[in-house]
């Protein structure tokens, strides 16, 4: 934290937070809620300043800024801590969760706690998961079975896991920048995209890929990371308040994202999109070898996998 002094001489600790989306995004709103509540609960001793829209740089560099003390917190993809500890691959593994609620229950159950604290040796800690929604496939035809994906070129993030996932699902993955997807679909360079309903609608991909099929291959976790210097600088009482508000903000974000998905679907349907609901088990079975490989890479990942499965059965 940096420190400011008010006109009446009180010290205010500034919590600097980086985020790559705009102020309308559910993740921004959840972080704003956390900051406002913490400021109120500490009688103004802490104030959160959020830098949205990626103004402080690429998400991949945020962990380094936090490690050096240039930032206190950030919302980043799970691939960022995975760069420090490969066990984080399990958190965003294909077909690990049934839906966003399953990911929420897993996060709040404490299933990730051991893994999340493991990065303290790198001077940052993962505090919680914020969802970025469920990723599904969209194309100019409905996708009901893995056979429907045969030979189709599907745009994915630049990730070995994503490329392998599409291969197991029956298609051919190709990495491509999000900004290029609309034109690539329009020109037939790719046959399909895969992302959340928000992205599908915000980028107007329904204009070039009418069918949005709920393959539900990824329930997307982003993570909130924080500097250990910032966390350790808090008193025990303030830290207890902060931890409670982090959990509250997790619930807030999942609820807000679910609401935004419904709005995105209505918008897409009004513009001619057709939502398709295949049997996801057909795709899950195809991807099971990939999930087994990721979940079996260490004792930590095995424990997390077992906890996730137990929570599935408790539903």
PLM region descriptions:
Residues 1-100, 120-315:
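N-terminal secretory/targeting leader peptides
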Residues 105-123, 129:
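Hinge/lid segment of periplasmic solute-binding proteins
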């Amino acid at each position: 934290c940096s420190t400011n002094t008010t006109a009446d001489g009180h010290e205010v600790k500034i919590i600097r937070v980086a985020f790559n989306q705009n102020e309308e995004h559910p993740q921004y709103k959840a972080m704003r809620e956390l900051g406002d509540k913490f400021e109120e609960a500490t009688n103004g001793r802490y104030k959160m300043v959020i830098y949205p829209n990626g103004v402080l740089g690429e998400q991949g560099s945020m962990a380094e800024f936090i490690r050096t003390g240039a930032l206190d917190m950030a919302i980043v993809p799970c691939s960022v801590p995975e760069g420090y500890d490969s066990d984080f691959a399990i958190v965003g593994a294909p077909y690990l969760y049934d839906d966003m609620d399953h990911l929420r229950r897993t996060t709040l159950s404490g299933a990730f706690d051991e893994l999340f604290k493991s990065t303290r040796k790198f001077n940052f800690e993962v505090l919680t998961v914020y969802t970025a929604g469920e990723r599904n496939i969209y194309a100019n035809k409905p996708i009901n079975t893995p056979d429907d994906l045969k030979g189709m070129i599907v745009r994915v993030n630049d990730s070995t896991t994503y490329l392998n996932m599409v291969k197991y699902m029956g298609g051919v993955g190709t990495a491509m920048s999000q900004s290029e997807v609309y034109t690539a679909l329009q020109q037939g360079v790719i046959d399909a995209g895969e992302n959340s309903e928000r992205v599908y609608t915000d980028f107007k991909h329904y204009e070039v890929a009418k069918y949005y099929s709920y393959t539900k291959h990824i329930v997307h976790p982003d993570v909130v990371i924080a500097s250990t210097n910032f966390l350790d600088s808090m008193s025990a009482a303030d830290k207890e308040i902060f931890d409670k508000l982090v959990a509250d903000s997790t619930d807030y974000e999942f609820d807000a994202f679910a609401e935004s998905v419904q709005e995105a679907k209505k918008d897409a349907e009004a513009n001619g999109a057709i939502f398709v609901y295949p049997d996801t088990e057909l795709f899950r079975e195809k991807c099971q070898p990939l999930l087994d490989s990721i979940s079996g890479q260490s004792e930590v990942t095995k424990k997390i996998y077992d906890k996730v499965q137990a929570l599935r059965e408790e539903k």
